[in-house]
Amino acid sequence: MAYRQTTTKTTFEVNNVIQPIFTGGSVALDNGARILATTLGEQAVLTELNTGKQLAEIEGDGEPISTLTITPSASHLIVCSRSLTMRIYSLKVSPDYDSIEATLVRTTKPHATPVVVLAVDRTSTLLATGAADGAIKIWDIVGGYVTHTVSGPSVLISALHFFEIAALEDQASNKNKKNRRKSTAEEEQAQDDSVASKFRLAYGTQDGKIRIFDLSKRKTYPVYADPTSRREAHESNVQSLDYSPELHALLSGSRDKTMTVWLWKEGTWRGTPMLRHEGVEAVGFLNNGSLMYSAGTSGLLRLWDTTTHQEITAKQDAKSEAESIVSALALPHKNLVVCAQSDFTLALYRTPSVADATKKSTKPLEPFRRISGTHDEILDLVYLLPDQSLMALATNSEDIRLVSVADKQPQLGDEEEGAAYFGHDVALLKGHEDIVMSLDVDWSGHWVASGAKDNTARLWRVDPANNSFECYAVFTGHIESVGAVALPKIVPPENSEAFKNPLDHPPAFLISGSQDRFVQKRDIPRTSQKGAVSTSLRRLAHEKDINALDISPNGKLFASASQDKTVKIWDSATLEVVGILKGHRRGVWTVRFAPQGMPAIQGETGTAVSGKGVILTGSGDKTIKLWNLSDYTCLRTFEGHSHNVLKVVWLRLPKAADDAEDEAAAAASKAKQRIQFASAGADSLVKVWDANLGETECTLDNHEDRLWTLTVHPKTNMLVSGGSDSRVTFWKDTSAETHAAASSAALKLVEQEQQLENYIHAGAYRDAIILALQLNHPGRLLGIFTNVVTTNAPEEGSLCGIKAVDQVLGNLSDEQIFLLLLRLRDWNTNARTAPVAQRILWALVRLYPANKFSNLSVKGARGQKSLKEVLNALRVYTERHYKRIEELVDESYLVEYTLQEMDSLAPPAIEERDGDLVMADA
């Protein structure tokens, strides 16, 4: 049976994107803990912290951002870059925190070297900039001018902090205001001056110095560890500073592995250092000064008692190097600390309340939420759980990241710890010691297999309902990286215990393939194993690296794809080769068995293939091949990618008609099913193919680098692509919506065309012109105007012949005027239709002032440039027609002159008088 292509168009649209927001550098948060500002290379990104929604992405100036900050009131964003420029943006937040309008209000060059640190005071009016050459300036944010210049040291400024030493006294005085007489205006002014005189700026340097600048006196005061010997506060970078108005104490943290509390005594700052075993990157006061926190290279957030200077968090082991903390910021009034890690993850911690802070010890702090700033290079991804609400990502690291892809969105103001939104980080699967390269999942979505560069494969048990994410078994035996793993996907009977409780029934076996060219089959134990699981069967499979594995739907066969340009089909029970697929000219990167229930597929020769089924392969030769598993021959080759094909997946088959009356009708319905698959390549494109026609149905483009992985939602046909650009794109199948919209538009078009015919037939030119413009029918519009202009009985006072048409022309929108000018331009190029065009153009010029045409606002047009081109074309042809008419007039005088000359040469006229002919006098 010949395959006939359906007219339904296949379309996909971007439904969601998980994309990077932070790739190292500065992190800032407003006072309401709602707007997170992060550095993304040359760009600044603003994100709503509760919902994870990206509110704005601010383009850079071509150079990487050196530092940024946001004011506590979220009124301004300040961005400094390596180009030595500082840009100040005014922020306008929507009431529902759904978007932010960032307006550039000022660009300046603050220093001769890059600005490396910024600080804003609590009133959001003052900004301090610290440069790499040690220069410090204080700015008025709104005014954009420098208020103070600090003569700092000639070394890099590493920390800045505004504080007010009179804040505590002001609070106490405010409590007693009701019991005192009202101050006079002079007293209030004096009080304001007193408060202003207490503003200070503390700064730390790369060589361990701490200085305090008095904004009122414009003086700088040193802070020495030993005032007598003038030994500096620290021996290395001062990374963080904070001030407690309750204690009148300054806190500093340094990479010399110390943090110090400085108290004002006897006219000088005296410090009490607390030795630590890690470089300190961030410190601060919590709970009105009763607690201190510190964070550093160990990746731990520690709490300290301010009075005893002792750590109150229980002993904890240092975390991995990737989890070391490089910076932190705290909002004590929100009991929140946000830590930035080396792997570009933002970890959010809840700090103890005032009541809990009185305890002498507390359990180690763990983040209640993680935000992946970037997922780095995404090597593989799979859907998890029966409802496909989680996704596992292999992200060029030793940990597997689990993210939420559920449709649920948090409500405004929902600050529940761990509240899931789309793209929210749920958990990390830790266990591998090197980069995870491949993933696979069983039928239930609760069991995940992984292969890594540590030469092992692991099986993970995922149970988010009980917050359980554990490694079930470790499989060793390979001597090189495990680049491919596969699990059987046989669905057990619905009444079986394995179907009802999949968490208690792991898959039967696991297949792994490695760069050591071996494939191994491992029988999975029924109980969790602490040690390594031995290999059941092992075979030397290929001559080069094994790139991909796939198990057939019934579990009886599996396929291995290799860099040796071949794909081998194996018996799963015996690990014996049953067939070899040869034909690719380069290494094979991906392989995928057709799903169960696949209809017969038509090959290039026109022969329908069913039987044992078919299999897809994608290769470095830029082609995809469809193979017959009955005789292992190539049925069809698909060409279209411009680079390596790295992943192929079958799309879900459309459901056959349920109302088929007999088996023959059901078979016919199944035969008409559209068989499609998708591919992802190193050309950063996703292509959807028709398996029977061998043609591309559509091409999807939303990535900037090679795509390593592609998967499909088993129920909705949602495609998910990921690759080297750190972006995960979710493509929604909109074919049904597109078909419905096209059908509706076609039906509406037929109705409108019939209505237009009715208007023309009835002579309702007013309605006909409006509809013809709407439908963009230039031929019919010309016919209407021709009838109007050439009417035998033009109405008196009408510009074009009929006053109703004049009224229509005088009430056109900008888009309609522009469209009509386009049509007049085309008609004006033809001498036959030019008179009609000139008449209508004359009517338009009379009906509208000149500024109407010069200020046309048209969507889709290239602005004034496009309008100028149209008017210029009208002018050129109008001048040509005018010249032609002038020449015709001149030629008409020649005819008159000729006739006159002919009259002069004629004999005198003969006049008849009284019946006689008499010659007239000459």
Give the location of each predicted region.
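Loop/turn segments within WD40 beta-propeller blades
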Residues: 26-33, 68-75, 112, 117-125, ...
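WD40/WD-repeat beta-propeller blade N-cap
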Residues: 16-23, 59-65, 108-115, 150-157, ...
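Intrinsically disordered, low-complexity acidic/Ser/Thr/Pro-rich linker and tail segments
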Residues: 1-56, 64-67, 73-98, 159-221, ...
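WD40-repeat beta-propellers
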Residues: 44-48, 86-91, 136-140, 210-214, ...
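Extended acidic/polar alpha-helical scaffold segments
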Residues: 798-922
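Blade-level signature of beta-propeller repeat domains, shared across WD40, Kelch, NHL, RCC1
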Residues: 708-739
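A structural motif specific to WD40 beta-propellers
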Residues: 15, 53-56, 97, 103-106, ...
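Conserved strand-to-loop turn within each blade of WD40 beta-propeller repeats
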Residues: 39-40, 80-83, 130-133, 203-207, ...
